[in-house]
Amino acid sequence: MNCLEKITNEYGQKTASRLEQFVKLIEEENKKINLTSFEGQRLWQEGIYESIKCLEPFVKSNDSLLDIGAGVGFPSVPFLIVNPEVKLTIIESNKKRVLFLEKVKKDLNLSFEIFNGRVENFNKEIHFDFITARALAPLNILMELTINLGSILPKPTNYIFVKGANYLSELNEAQNAIKILKLKVFDLKKIDVFFDKNIFMIHYIKTANVSKEYPRAWDKIIKKPIR
């Protein structure tokens, strides 16, 4: 059974057809500009199916979700196609990818917001139930970069980041960031998919407001990450 057949069995023909339309848009645009290295079955497996399964244990209908550096829309757009009632916002700094996401939004008649800019310049005071990112940066950098995007009240924002087989080493390197940024790790969840790859979700919240010096400017975060 290929990935499309598996998706059809799990989510129905209508949803599978919309995901197929999304994949075709990616493939067409990838011929013009390099949007993603995923193609063929890898696009379906790692781009589409894995994205859905990573978010599925956490995000429910009507939850608000912020996806940082989504690129062509992974992991949030495939999940939105399956769960159209999710309130999605995407931050993407690459203008070509933003234009592609706008085309996806129009052609598939999806409802989501796109912010074209860097995450540190996103200063809208909006509560998000969940914040996610995939393949954007090491965990200690992600933690600082996104510290001001999450809320404590009226309920804590859940940070859920997609990581690979080296998730434990990233988590160990982030221990000082966890202390300084007053975070609490809730869960390390292994995502089981039908192909041979280890995917883990690191789930945490922030427990208190932190010093105004955080997050630092991007160049300082990169040059001297919290360790």
UniProtKB/Swiss-Prot annotation:
Transmembrane segments: none annotated. GO terms for cellular component: cytosol. Its main location: cytoplasm. Keywords: Cytoplasm, Methyltransferase, rRNA processing, S-adenosyl-L-methionine, Transferase. It comes from the Bacteria. One of its GO terms (molecular function) is rRNA (guanine-N7-)-methyltransferase activity. Gene3D superfamilies: Vaccinia Virus protein VP39. S-adenosyl-L-methionine binds at residues 69, 74, 119-120, 134. It is found in: Cytoplasm. PANTHER family: S-ADENOSYL-L-METHIONINE-DEPENDENT METHYLTRANSFERASES SUPERFAMILY PROTEIN (PTHR31760:SF0). Specifically methylates the N7 position of a guanine in 16S rRNA. This is Ribosomal RNA small subunit methyltransferase G. It comes from Mycoplasmopsis pulmonis (strain UAB CTIP) (Mycoplasma pulmonis). The gene is rsmG.
